[in-house]
Amino acid sequence: KIIAKEPCIVAGLEVATAVFRTVDENLVVTAHCQNGDLLANKQMILEVSGSARSILKAERVTLNFLGRMCGIATLTRKYVDQLAGTKAQLLDTRKTTPGLRILEKSATVVGGARNHRFGLSDGVIIKENHIRAAGGITIAVERLSESLPPTIKIEVEVSNLQEAQEALDAGAELIMLDNMSLAEMEMAVRTIRGRALLEASGNVTLENVRQVAETGVDFISTGAIIHSSRWADLSLLFEV
């Protein structure tokens, strides 16, 4: 059986099952909880019966996936809990482990966040380097507007109120407030409210995410829920 050795949010049950069944299709895997459940210390996650050799072969890979995904879901839930009572929604980012993006981003959803882009094809964000290469926010938005289907929204990353106003005037439907102070974010919300969606990003921590949400932004994105999460402490124990 696999047990939690500390309180955590469960994520990755289907991945764990797939690992065991890939190693040996005759293994019987029984989950004792559901993704998203909060487990107590020493609570059982799943039970596996069958060949001891097969179970041991799959043990480390299974625990690696589960530990990583449970850790992400657990930290994400802590962030989401801080947003209770505000309208802000938590978003993940593309700062993921190479090869594991789908699994890591699925774990943030289990924890209560929403997925931002999986890749560049999922949406358009005009960032600092794009703006410099194009020669300015307005021209960057205009060029994209000419080539994009009308169903795709354009988001622009800005670092101050002047840039936020320019992005709005250029036609951006989403504006990312990057590394702006709480006071600047509050001013941006008052100025832009209802005319574009606002996303706060940069230096978001568990300690300040509530304050960021209270500025009135629509979304808060942070890579920390993935890249700074700690693996959940899990263990596989044999019973004969």
Model-derived regions: residue spans:
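Glycine-rich beta-strand-to-loop/alpha-helix junction loops that act as flexible
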Residues: 177-178, 198-204, 222-224
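Short, charged, intrinsically disordered terminal tails
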Residues: 224-240
